[in-house]
Amino acid sequence: MGSSDQATAHARAQAASARLFDDACAVIPGGVNSPVRAFTAVGGTPPFITAARGCRLTDADGNHYVDLVCSWGPMILGHAHPAVVEAVAKAAASGLSFGAPTPAESELAAEMIARVAPVERIRLVNSGTEATMSAVRLARGFTGRAKIVKFSGCYHGHVDALLADAGSGVATLGLPSSPGVTGATAADTIVLPYNDIDAVRQAFTEFGDQIAAVITEASPGNMGVVPPAPGFNAALRALTADHGALLIVDEVMTGFRVSRSGWYGIDPVDADLFTFGKVMSGGLPAAAFGGRAEVMERLAPLGPVYQAGTLSGNPVAMAAGLATLRHADAAAYAALDANADRLARLLSDALTNAGVPHQIPRAGNMLSVFFTDTPVTDFASARATQTWRYPPFFHALLDAGVYPPCSAFETWFVSTALDDDAFDRIAAALPAAARAAAGADEGNS
């Protein structure tokens, strides 16, 4: 089959998704409700997913894919896990939302507190953005200070104060920040290079009595996977404590994914506040922030820092989260680690055989593919990689029935549901994908 025939066949295979995308673009800005889903970084039409089970996705055209995105992290047990589906159905049968306290809220909060030792109180919210926004407000209210330190390439949701030089979709689209963020808001945000503890010391030297908090991803995964240098998070803890500022560790991505206790189980730094999302709600919309009782009890109704949400603690989302966490046992985390090891080996072998420079950094069972010979340690080195190799690599995998992240700056996620057949498909797809990356032309990026 010639290249034109392949293009025609692929167009036919995506015809239903293409129609759905056109329909979506008529009513939704860009046709998507989160920018990275539009395939801007890789080109082409995004498949419209109609079903998922285990480690496999099905799109509107009937194509099947091995899922290496896992809804951007939360689906650690795979899609439609029977215990999670049963818990959701049972909760939904009793009512979808009450706007009142429910037992499941306290049960999920207690489960999370039992896993992360420094967390003494939890407040449930609806999204990771809401969690980080609320944690920042609480830090300012607790300290009486205004400035927040964040790191270039770390993404903490689309909070105005935290969008400056952020990762995730902001990096994918090549945006330095976002219009609509006022100068006054930006002025209270200090953006520093990631993994540069000397820069943090200098910021405290200049602004120490004005800094309310330092916020960092526990192990960043929104500029690709860029783990903290050994001791970096602990040094942040020491500096914030010395200057009366709070440390906020964002575990929205890593929380309860990379271990039973999230990144805290790997690098146990006692932050003042943590934010959580994704895994804790089993794929439904819920998130949380929590920390020391002394700090958390400044929240209304106990204290003056206001935070509220009509759907916070939604009983159906709580049921999904509880079922997910209760089935995420030691065997599940061992399987996640083994599957990440297996995927990383397959990726590295294929890229090595094709002569493609690459790094595959890991944060527990999270990983990334960077096209470079040089280790990536911060946002600058992530952006300096050969990202133009990624679109042909991505599309070769997608065409072969493997669904990887649609940006070089996003994380690859595994689930416990990956089986030998799935890995066989990945292994069969990778040589051609690696050759496509090897033959990529920077001028066509």
Curated annotation (Swiss-Prot):
Subunit: Homodimer.
UniProt entry keywords in alphabetical sequence: Cytoplasm, Isomerase, Porphyrin biosynthesis, Pyridoxal phosphate
Keyword Isomerase found: yes
Family of the protein in this entry: Belongs to the class-III pyridoxal-phosphate-dependent aminotransferase family. HemL subfamily.
Location within or outside the cell: Cytoplasm
Catalytic activity: (S)-4-amino-5-oxopentanoate = 5-aminolevulinate
Keyword Cytoplasm among UniProt keywords: yes
Gene Ontology molecular function terms on file: glutamate-1-semialdehyde 2,1-aminomutase activity; pyridoxal phosphate binding; transaminase activity
One biological process term in Gene Ontology: protoporphyrinogen IX biosynthetic process
Gene Ontology CC annotations of this record: cytoplasm
Pathway assignment: Porphyrin-containing compound metabolism; protoporphyrin-IX biosynthesis; 5-aminolevulinate from L-glutamyl-tRNA(Glu): step 2/2
Primary localization: cytoplasm
PANTHER family noted in UniProt: GLUTAMATE-1-SEMIALDEHYDE 2,1-AMINOMUTASE, GLUTAMATE-1-SEMIALDEHYDE 2,1-AMINOMUTASE 1, CHLOROPLASTIC-RELATED
InterPro entries, sorted: 4pyrrol_synth_GluAld_NH2Trfase, Aminotrans_3, Aminotrans_3_PPA_site, PyrdxlP-dep_Trfase, PyrdxlP-dep_Trfase_major, PyrdxlP-dep_Trfase_small
Cofactor dependency: pyridoxal 5'-phosphate
Record-linked SUPFAM superfamilies: PLP-dependent transferases (SSF53383)
EC number: 5.4.3.8
Domain of life: Bacteria
N6-(pyridoxal phosphate)lysine modified-residue sites: 278
Protein name listed in UniProt: Glutamate-1-semialdehyde 2,1-aminomutase
